[in-house]
Amino acid sequence: MVLEAIRYKDGKLSIIDQLQLPFTERYIEIRTSEEGWQAIKNMQVRGAPAIAIVAALSLASELHELSIRNKISTTAEDVTAFIRERLGHLVSSRPTAVNLSDAARKLEVIVSERSQTPGSTAQDIVNVFIQAAEGMLAKDVEDNTRIGENGAKWISMNALPTDHDKAVVLTHCNTGSLATAGYGTALGVIRSLMANNTLQHAYCTETRPYNQGSRLTAFELVHDKIPATLITDSMAAALLSRPETRVNAIVVGADRVAANGDTANKIGTYGLAVLARYHGVKFLVAAPLTTIDLATKSGGDIVIEERPPSEVTRVKGSREDDTTGDVRLETISIAAEGINVWNPAFDVTPSELIDGIITEKGVAEKDTDGRFHLEELFD
């Protein structure tokens, strides 16, 4: 059974609090767009597809409740203005992830078109927004399943020495059910390999400084009983150099893919791509079309979010009381007091280092001149 990180039914939204994982599996209710903004900003939910879905559904939940309590504005124009303002606020929570702004833009278009229809009421606007937001949830799961299947097929055909070999795959950060509406992107590829009986072993990086790999990806791999090993980020080069390990592919997710294929993803991705090229390992990006931003021409145009220094200088873990056996979460300092910290959340991997971009439409590869033509995916 695949982990369910987002629960939504009849206007009620709850998410698993990822800050508590892997020690406590606790769901929190999200009732308003402001609570959605806080959950995204505080990284209680993270992963580009997931934050877009949670943002949309948080506003859908708020509108659903306002509608039940008869507190919706009386005119279609007022409701439309309210939705636009709330969507703009939600986008500000994580600016690097294009899925969030893309979802907001699509929802705004749907609402604007309905508001311009003669005779549209305020409730009509609410209904069309809720329907569209709920549709995004279902579509993301469907798209992720296709991404997983496409990636598994590509690896089997292009990264394995023979048809009889099984894949050894390294992944970074968390790109599974916890980062999406379900199944996952890069981790979905690993799940599909496992389902096809073509996975030998998966490796996941710790993913400092927020430890999404050790806290979240490892949690999902254990949950799904996938054969896997956790390594620290600094062990990747040693892992790739071991003949007995024989890593066939590195598969990562993406927060934004520029028109030329440059990819912004969790900090450390660029370094893995460099290592992959040196060691002759296939390097793949797995992302839905909503992550591809054709308006951004190259990685140099991508805004990179910087996170608080405390995420580097402190770490959270569980402590068991020797007397009672009770487990509680504690945050401790691990760095010298007063040291300066640089903490970019993402880096940009040049398209030259990427062998393929896995989408729900298929796997985009470069032409003979070494260029991606991602616009063709939208034809």
Curated annotation (Swiss-Prot):
It holds the Pfam family IF-2B. Its EC number is 5.3.1.23. It is an enzyme of class 5 (isomerase). Pathway: Amino-acid biosynthesis; L-methionine biosynthesis via salvage pathway; L-methionine from S-methyl-5-thio-alpha-D-ribose 1-phosphate: step 1/6. The active site is at 255 (proton donor). It is found in: Cytoplasm; Nucleus. InterPro entries: IF-2B-related, IF-M1Pi, IF_2B-like_C, Initiation_fac_2B_a/b/d, M1Pi_N, NagB/RpiA_transferase-like. The record marks 173 as: Transition state stabilizer. SUPFAM superfamilies: NagB/RpiA/CoA transferase-like. The keyword Plastid does not apply. The keyword tRNA processing does not apply. It catalyses: 5-(methylsulfanyl)-alpha-D-ribose 1-phosphate = 5-(methylsulfanyl)-D-ribulose 1-phosphate. Keywords: Amino-acid biosynthesis, Cytoplasm, Isomerase, Methionine biosynthesis, Nucleus. GO terms for biological process: L-methionine salvage from methylthioadenosine. One of its GO terms (molecular function) is S-methyl-5-thioribose-1-phosphate isomerase activity. HAMAP family: Salvage_MtnA. Catalyzes the interconversion of methylthioribose-1-phosphate (MTR-1-P) into methylthioribulose-1-phosphate (MTRu-1-P). Belongs to the eIF-2B alpha/beta/delta subunits family. MtnA subfamily. NCBIfam families: eIF-2B_rel (TIGR00524), PRK05720.1 (NF004326), salvage_mtnA (TIGR00512). This is Methylthioribose-1-phosphate isomerase. It comes from Emericella nidulans (strain FGSC A4 / ATCC 38163 / CBS 112.46 / NRRL 194 / M139) (Aspergillus nidulans). The lineage of its organism: Eukaryota, Fungi, Dikarya, Ascomycota, Pezizomycotina. The gene is mri1.
